[in-house]
Regions:
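N-terminal beta1-alpha1 cap of cysteine-dependent amidohydrolase-like domains
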Residues: 1-264
């Protein structure tokens, strides 16, 4: 229900603003339609006027097309994706991953049914019951040792059952550990971050980090180059073999294991 003009005038009077500055925010059938509704109400223009900035009409063509695509998606067209981590009690802990999945669904005209799973609940015995019938699994980043064995069991299940898998940050590091343990037979493989005495530290501390003792705010940050293997899935997705990606890490892949891991 739209605000009647007399109510708009009354709000403007008692709030000591111009009537054009009274902006209504109606209930929308799609969250992403709200910015367009606010633009139609003149919110952008009013903000520019208040801040004495030049105002212009934005080109929302791509945004409108995205919303049209969202509304065309059939409810029964779903892709089930699990996010397996240890911060799942607070969904916003993985908000960037969740939003990325939703936007991927918009681009591919499918609904993404996201299942948040606590990695501490994943064991050899529970993996099948918790991870079956999934179309994909994501193990995102995190800190500390808690829940890591569950992540490794998750990754093993995905590999053995041909479930598409994406490891992000610590998730990819645990994928290296899983492969080393269960495919290469290096049973005690681990990250040196969690087991400094492991005989097979397939993930180890970066050389430039070894002399850093103050841990707060000292990770390697920023964009770094990466060479992708020719013909690999990653190179096909990027469409090139040299990429630059942002990093925030203290530990990395141990290149002493490059040959044995690449061979398999």
């Amino acid at each position: 229900m739209e605000i009647p003009e007399n109510i708009r005038e009354k709000l403007a009077l008692f709030c000591n603003v111009r009537k054009s500055s009274v902006i209504q925010n109606l209930t929308a059938d799609c969250l992403y339609a709200v910015p367009l509704m606010l633009e139609k109400e003149g919110l952008g223009r009013e903000i520019c006027n208040h801040l004495r900035l030049d105002s212009y009409i934005p080109d929302n063509t791509e945004w409108i097309e995205m919303i049209d695509n969202i509304r065309k998606i059939k409810k029964d067209e779903k892709v089930k994706i699990a996010i397996v981590g240890k911060y799942v009690r607070l969904e916003d802990s993985y908000i960037s991953v969740i939003e990325s999945l939703r936007h991927a669904g918009f681009a591919n005209n499918v609904n993404i049914d996201i299942k948040l799973i606590d990695s501490e609940t994943i064991t050899k015995e529970t993996a099948e019951s918790k991870l079956k019938d999934l179309d994909g699994i994501i193990v995102p980043g995190g800190f500390g040792n808690r829940g890591n064995e569950g992540k490794i069991e998750t990754i093993k299940f995905a590999r053995e059952n041909n479930i598409p898998f994406l490891g992000i940050c610590l998730g990819m590091q645990m994928a290296v550990v899983e492969f080393a343990r269960n495919v290469l037979g290096l049973a005690d493989s681990n990250s040196a971050e969690f087991n400094e005495s492991t005989k097979n530290p397939v993930i180890h501390i970066m050389e430039e980090q070894k002399k850093i003792y103050k841990k707060g705010g000292t990770m390697r940050l920023g964009s770094y180059p990466c060479i992708l293997k020719q013909g690999s899935l990653a190179s096909k997705l990027y469409g090139k073999e040299k990429i630059d990606e942002r990093h925030r890490h203290r530990y990395e892949y141990n290149n002493e294991y490059k040959e044995i891991l690449s061979f398999r």
